[in-house]
């Protein structure tokens, strides 16, 4: 029989208040709290801590504080990753971000899904869908990316956008919901 954690990573319905999940969530909350308390000028210490939190990152990963995530180990970022203040990643499923990606302030990336039916939602059951972001992507401030989204390479997402469907490579998207407004070179 699968554990709730195994169900979560498999994209199956799982009980979000499971004891094992709560322990993992709290461990990550503590790690994020510790990261957020490191002085901004202590770059080496910050980088060491963020590498402990994330599932994959490089020496050139830079995430401005504060930073929040649920598990951390499900987040994989490529080379030369930069995120500005207040990045929130609900990583119940894997979040994979390519090389040369830049994220503005107050961006939220969600993988957790809940029922829209209040009775079902109150059971604390949910499911998760991975988010994949390609190479050379700029995500403007206050953007929200919903569960299950794939964003192609060479994409710009305008500030304040809500990404509710996949984004092809080589475009600029803006709005709520985010829509393609033009193609980009590259």
Q: Predicted regions span which residues?
A:
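Terminal amphipathic alpha-helical/low-complexity segments used for targeting or macromolecular assembly
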Residues: 1-60, 178-182, 186
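Short arginine-rich
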Residues: 36, 165-170
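Flexible, glycine/small-residue-enriched loop-and-beta-strand segment within the central core
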Residues: 40, 67-77, 82-150, 171, ...
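Beta-rich strand-turn-strand
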Residues: 140-166
């Amino acid at each position: 029989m699968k554990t709730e954690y195994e169900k979560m990573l498999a994209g199956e319905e799982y009980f979000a208040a499971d004891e094992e999940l709560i322990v993992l969530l709290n461990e990550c909350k503590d790690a994020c709290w510790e990261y957020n308390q490191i002085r901004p000028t202590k770059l080496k210490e910050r980088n060491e801590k963020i590498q402990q939190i994330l599932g994959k990152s490089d020496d050139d990963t830079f995430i401005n504080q504060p930073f929040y995530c649920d598990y951390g180990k499900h987040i994989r970022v490529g080379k030369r990753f930069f995120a500005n203040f207040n990045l929130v990643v609900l990583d119940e499923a894997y979040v994979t971000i390519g090389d040369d990606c830049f994220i503005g302030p107050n961006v939220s990336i969600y993988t957790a899904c809940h029922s829209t039916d209040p009775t079902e939602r109150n059971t604390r059951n949910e499911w998760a869908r991975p988010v994949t972001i390609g190479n050379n992507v700029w995500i403007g401030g206050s953007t929200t990316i919903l569960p299950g989204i794939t964003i192609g390479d060479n994409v710009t997402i305008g500030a304040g956008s809500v990404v509710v469907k996949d984004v092809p490579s080589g475009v600029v998207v803006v709005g709520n919901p985010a829509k393609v407004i033009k193609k980009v070179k590259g």
